[in-house]
Amino acid sequence: MNKELKILELFAGVGGFRIGFENSNKELYKTNWSNQWEPSRKTQDAFEVYNYHFPDSMNINENIEEIPDSIFKKMDADIIVGGFPCQDYSVARSKKNEMGIQGKKGVLFWEIIRAVTQIKPQYLVLENVDRLLKAPSKQRGRDFAIMLAAFNELGYSVEWRIINAAEYGRSQRRRRVFFFVYRNDTAFAKKMDRKFESENSDVFFESHLYDEYIFNDGLFARQFPILPQPIKNRHATYKLSSDIVDISDNFIGTVWNTGIMRHGRYFTIDTVPTMEETPIPLGKILEDEENVHEKYYVTDEKRLEKFKYLRGSKKIERTSVEGHKYIYSEGGMAPTDDLKLPGRTMLTSEGTVNRSTHFIELNGRYRLITPIEAERLQDFPDNWTKFKKLSDGNVVEVSDRMRMFFMGNALVTEIVKRIADELQNIVFEDI
């Protein structure tokens, strides 16, 4: 085994993947390259936080679409990691090349594929919102099938699982889909071939050859155990078309929360966690009250009433774009967040006056969570996002609003650490 595994972190944000991998094994995992670009903002705050903490790697602050192939080609990364946006993955025939495909401009998944084509890493670990598996609404599962086909075309297998961090002992009910992608010429892939593949491909569809992989042998099964049977016998197999455009136009299939794609076929099961791990309650990650600044308390009656209204049930008459009226209804939720339960999913709007913001009551007073508490919900070190380094080298403080925005976009780093722990075991198996 190499003395170190070199990592390229794409869509790096403030470094969640890097924290997770380094917390697993800082001597083994070396993030030598990163890319972070916020297209909708003039200031590049997330990049500046990342660069403050990790000045020694090659940190690229430009639109990934503008990074030339030649730069990727020079990166001898063993692993690519990243959490990428959920977008429209549909493809069409290229007008310049009838045999080629063309994704919609600005869809960043295709930049991952471009990087993989140039770098040819052994492994990828990727993250996205769980609704990706059901997108788009009019052709459920199509986008994910396109992604699987793209990796298959490059000679990779893909294992996936939707993971709710709270179901594996963390302090936030955050559901995300994680992918473990591995090249088909790795020793791990060859080992899986010997164990699960059959010379008669039809057997794959008539049996449950990959059940043992999904329930026991796969990366996610080892670190995030599940009950050994599908929910309501929900399982499906599907042979992907060799034509990605055909998948884009005609895919009709099922994708459950757990699965494996190998050699152009996928097997998917709807699974449930063993629930053996107790989540950390919200109350346990709160700062000591004497350290909480008064600005986080909500004392204004109008703001208190606004929170009460937003969290309450309501029926509102609205008018559609076409002009017809309809009733928008919203169920009620508890007036404040239960400190005995793990936190809810943080959004980028955390800390503003809205329904999704955490709103807590302590000793008869109401307040929002602090930036440090937001960092703890994502398993980041305290004050990780407090400072950033500007292009002129000056270090300045980051606003609370931006710190909350960062954490709403981030991932639970302890989940990443566990994935990295198991990847290390798999790499050792490759010896």
Predicted regions and their residues:
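Basic/polar N-terminal segments that are highly enriched at the extreme N-terminus
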Residues: 1-2, 431
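Short loop/turn segments at secondary-structure transitions that flank enzyme active sites
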Residues: 83, 183-187, 352, 383
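Core alpha/beta nucleotide-donor-binding catalytic domains of modification enzymes
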Residues: 2-120, 129-144
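C-terminal target-recognition/interaction regions appended to catalytic cores
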Residues: 251-431
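Class I S-adenosyl-L-methionine
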Residues: 70-77, 89-333
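Extracellular structured ligand-interaction cores
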Residues: 4-7, 174-178, 341-343
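Short, flexible loop/turn elements at secondary-structure junctions
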Residues: 11, 38-39, 130, 162-167, ...
